[in-house]
């Protein structure tokens, strides 16, 4: 897959939605970041919000991929299959931390292997979290290095964004997210049977 073309197409798709996408990512960041700074209960609240909001972010960017006008409310659609999403979030993060405990590379591999879980749940909300995890792992078989490379391609853009007093980073985050959603769309065709 040509990652440069994927990134260019994502940037073109994002153009009419860039201000809204920046706002969605900003709201996501505030809802995840602010409670954890308050106190111990705030950290717990952040953990409880992280999975559903991550799913909402995936729903938002998948809408753009599918040519559907997104809205800020998409960010909160991840709360509908709440238990399913929370269990997926806990398992993904526990396994990633376990992998990172042993070495950096296993943690990265585990994270990449489960990286499509939220997209799968977004498109198949009836799917149980363990099925979505398994499906993501199978889907990413042979694609982890390519996805890692896609993430690395955004590193210079984030660094350039930092040069512009961090404001530029807020322009890169939606582009990065849409590129990952587009990557999911590209690889899912061979891996998920439509239900």
Ranges and model annotations:
Residues 1-31, 69-98, 110-162, 192-195:
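Interfacial aromatic "cap" segments that immediately flank transmembrane helices
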Residues 38-69, 97-129, 158-193:
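Selective recognition of hydrophobic, aromatic-rich stretches within alpha-helical transmembrane segments
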């Amino acid at each position: 897959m040509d990652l440069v073309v994927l990134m260019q197409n994502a940037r073109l798709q994002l153009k009419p939605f860039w201000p809204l996408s920046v706002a969605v990512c900003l709201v996501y960041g505030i809802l995840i970041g602010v409670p954890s700074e308050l106190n111990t209960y705030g950290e717990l609240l952040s953990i409880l919000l992280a999975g559903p909001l991550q799913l909402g972010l995936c729903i938002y960017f998948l809408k753009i991929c599918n040519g559907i006008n997104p809205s800020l409310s998409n960010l909160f659609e991840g709360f509908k299959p709440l238990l399913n999403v929370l269990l997926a979030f806990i398992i993904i993060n526990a396994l990633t931390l376990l992998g990172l405990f042993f070495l950096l590379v296993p943690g990265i591999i585990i994270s990449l292997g489960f990286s499509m879980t939220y997209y799968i749940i977004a498109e198949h909300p009836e799917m149980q979290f363990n099925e979505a995890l398994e499906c993501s792992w199978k889907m990413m078989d042979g694609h982890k290095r390519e996805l890692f490379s896609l993430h690395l391609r955004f590193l210079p853009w984030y660094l350039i964004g930092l040069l512009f007093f961090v404001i530029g980073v807020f322009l890169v985050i939606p582009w990065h997210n849409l590129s990952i959603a587009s990557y999911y769309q590209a690889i899912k065709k061979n891996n998920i049977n439509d239900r």
